[in-house]
Design a protein with these regions (language model features):
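Exposed loop/turn and edge beta-strand positions of beta-sandwich/beta-sheet ligand-binding modules
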Residues: 5, 40, 77, 111
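Conserved beta-strand in the GNAT
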Residues: 55-58, 126-128
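A short, acidic/glycine-rich surface segment
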Residues: 40-42, 63-69
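Core segments of cupin and vicinal oxygen chelate
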Residues: 12-54, 97, 105
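N-terminal beta-strand motif that seeds the catalytic metal site of vicinal oxygen chelate
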Residues: 1-20, 78-83, 131-132
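Vicinal oxygen chelate
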Residues: 1-2, 34, 92-132
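Short, charged/polar surface micro-motifs in flexible loops or helix N-caps
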Residues: 50-54, 60-64, 88-89
Length: 132
C-alpha cells in the first residue's frame, strides 16, 4: 500500500452552520451538502479550489458507522489540521478584521510562513504559505 495524500479531516460539532461558515468565509472553502444518506442538517463538506472535500463537518447527532466517544470542544488526540495556502497578506487581514486570535511563524530554511488560529471548536488550524 502507498498513501498518496491526506483525504479529509472530520470535525464533530454542536454548531454545524457556524463551523461551516467559519471555513467558507475565512478560507474560501466551498460549502456543499454531504452525499446521502447524510443530510444537510447533519453534515456539510467543505471543498477546496480543486473540488476536493477536505473538511467534513458532522453535527454531534449525525450517525457514524465507526464511532468513539467524542465531545464537542477539546479535540482529543487531534492536535491540528494543516492547510497548504496562498494569499498570506489577505488571510492575515481577514483574521485581524474578524478579531480572531492568531500566531505567526516563519521557517526560512524552506521558505515557509505560517499562521495558526483556532476554529469555533478549538481545532488548531495551521495555514502554510510556501513562497508567498
Amino acid at each position: 500500500m502507498r498513501v498518496n495524500a491526506l483525504d479529509h479531516v472530520n470535525i464533530i460539532t454542536a454548531d454545524l452552520d457556524g463551523t461551516a461558515r467559519f471555513y467558507a468565509e475565512l478560507f474560501g472553502l466551498e460549502r456543499r451538502n454531504a452525499p446521502p444518506p447524510l443530510t444537510p442538517q447533519n453534515a456539510q463538506w467543505m471543498h477546496d479550489g480543486a473540488g476536493r472535500a477536505i473538511i467534513h463537518i458532522n453535527h454531534v447527532d449525525c450517525p457514524r458507522l465507526f464511532d468513539r466517544a467524542v465531545e464537542p470542544g477539546p479535540t482529543g488526540a487531534l492536535h491540528h489540521v494543516a492547510l497548504n495556502c496562498t494569499g498570506f497578506a489577505e488571510t492575515l487581514a481577514q483574521l485581524k478584521t474578524r478579531g480572531l486570535a492568531h500566531r505567526l511563524n516563519e521557517v526560512t530554511a524552506i521558505g515557509l510562513r505560517q499562521i495558526f488560529t483556532l476554529d469555533p471548536n478549538s481545532v488548531l488550524i495551521e495555514l502554510n504559505f510556501f513562497g508567498d
